[in-house]
């Protein structure tokens, strides 16, 4: 997730924050978590990974939960649920019906292990539509990641002809009518990251 955090930091620098607070509403039903408190955060500083709370809620005896998330703009929001680190992208003035993963608490060994890292999971959203930022990013990542590893491997092997431009054009044709600036910045940064990585790998292979 480190690269994703860099993507998000870059986008935040481009877009900037407004001076007033807005809200997104999250809600759902998760009987597995009844009686638990769920806290949501965002990274107020991506370089130092500073986590700042943006909202919290209690899951009642019926498994129902809801919370107001304080955000300024499209924001990467996350929370810790046992072995999972769930995340999604929240936009102001929207409502998200979350589908939480089955509850799985950390074992004692995991809890005491300073190197244990939660499994990062993009949380399900039951009321998502195809124009939502979560749907767009997820669909893009699936297409992009299908080719990312192979292109990087080809670059490391010193292959002269790489399919970066054709990959970018192929993906962009599917999103050419998308108006979401956050999503546009996200895609462009991922493309730039791919080009940097392949350039580095090719340089390394040549020097060796």
Residue ranges and their predicted role:
Residues 1-28:
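Bacterial Sec-dependent N-terminal signal peptides
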Residues 22-182, 186-189, 193-207:
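A non-transmembrane, solvent-exposed segment enriched in polar/low-complexity residues
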């Amino acid at each position: 997730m480190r690269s994703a955090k860099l993507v998000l930091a870059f986008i935040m620098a481009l877009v900037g924050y407004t001076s007033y607070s807005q809200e997104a509403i999250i809600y759902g039903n998760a009987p597995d978590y009844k009686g638990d408190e769920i806290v949501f955060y965002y990274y107020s500083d991506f370089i130092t990974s500073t986590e700042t709370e943006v909202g919290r809620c209690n899951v009642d005896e019926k498994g129902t939960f809801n919370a107001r998330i304080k955000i300024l703009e499209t924001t990467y929001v996350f929370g810790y649920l046992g072995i999972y680190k769930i995340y999604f992208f929240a936009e102001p003035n929207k409502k998200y019906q979350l589908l939480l993963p089955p509850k799985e608490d950390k074992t004692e060994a995991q809890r005491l292990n300073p190197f244990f890292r939660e499994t990062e999971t993009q949380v399900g959203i039951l009321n998502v539509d195809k124009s939502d930022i979560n749907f767009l990013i997820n669909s893009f990542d699936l297409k992009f990641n299908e080719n990312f590893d192979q292109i990087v491997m080809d670059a490391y092997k010193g292959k002269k002809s790489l399919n970066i431009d054709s990959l970018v054009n192929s993906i962009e044709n599917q999103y050419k009518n998308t108006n979401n600036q956050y999503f546009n910045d996200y895609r462009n940064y991922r493309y730039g990251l791919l080009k940097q990585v392949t350039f580095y790998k090719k340089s390394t292979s040549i020097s060796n």
